[in-house]
Amino acid sequence: IKDPLGMVGSRLEVNSLIIDAFEPAVKSLVKVVETAGGEISGLIFGPLASSQSVLSKNQKDLGVALVDIGFGTIGLSVYEEGKLVHLAVFPVGASNVTNDLAIGLKISIEAAEAIKCSFGAALAKEVGSRELVDLQKIDPRAKGTASRRFIAEIMEMRLAEIFEFVNNELKRIGKAGRLPAGVVLVGGGAKLAGLIDLARQELRLPSQVGEPEFSNIVLPNGELAIKLE
């Protein structure tokens, strides 16, 4: 029952989803903001804040999963019948893609991040094998060139693994392939070329990039600064 107000009954029960956090980490975050002269009116779980910004009421009613691709973690929020029914966080994120590129191309982390942002793609088959990247122009200590397809192959392996985490979690709660409104991607890596197609392929669900409301601010790294009422 969505709204029991005014109804007659003999017993009222509720299923609640409780979000907790590591207290020292929360206190440290608050202290940093206050030390910088900022004021905190409240705290909210990141993926939950993102879902309030980019998901429509219709999507939440139909059934939708929001995948928040962060630097070090991936957040998953699942909605059905207008309610948040599941949350999960996975200890893998965009930084893992960068690390894989650094190892695979034998370049610095900084150069790997630059290559990911400038030449990266999520689906290797969509990238030409003859397109070459001069590694030394990005990292003076590097040698030779790398094809964009090879770069995409490295990235695709890690991104497919990330979607496997998400799909396994959806299977665990019985929602894999069963969310009519599909998957909405947000976060710094959400607009990577080919990522939507890879998400559709791995999750077997309609997929799209979440677009925030105008009152929110999209930061340079693709994260959201969200104004919540």
Model-derived features: positions:
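Residue-level signature of catalytic and energy-coupling elements of molecular machines
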Residues: V33, D68, L101, V166, ...
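Glycine-rich phosphate-binding loops at beta-strand->alpha-helix junctions
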Residues: A21, A121-L123, R178-E202
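Short, ordered loop/turn segments at secondary-structure junctions
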Residues: F45-A49, E81, F90-V92, C117, ...
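A conserved active-site cap/scaffold subdomain adjacent to cofactor or substrate pockets
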Residues: P91-I115
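Gly/Thr-rich phosphate-binding beta-strand-loop-beta motif of the actin/hexokinase/Hsp70
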Residues: L55-H86, L101
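Glycine-rich phosphate-binding/hydrolytic loop that grips phosphoryl groups
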Residues: E211-E229
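Nucleotide/phosphate-binding catalytic cleft detector across ATP-hydrolyzing
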Residues: I1-A65, L84, S108-E110, A114-A152, ...
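Phosphate/pyrophosphate-binding loops at sites that engage ATP/ADP/AMP, CoA/4′-phosphopantetheine
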Residues: F163, N167-G182
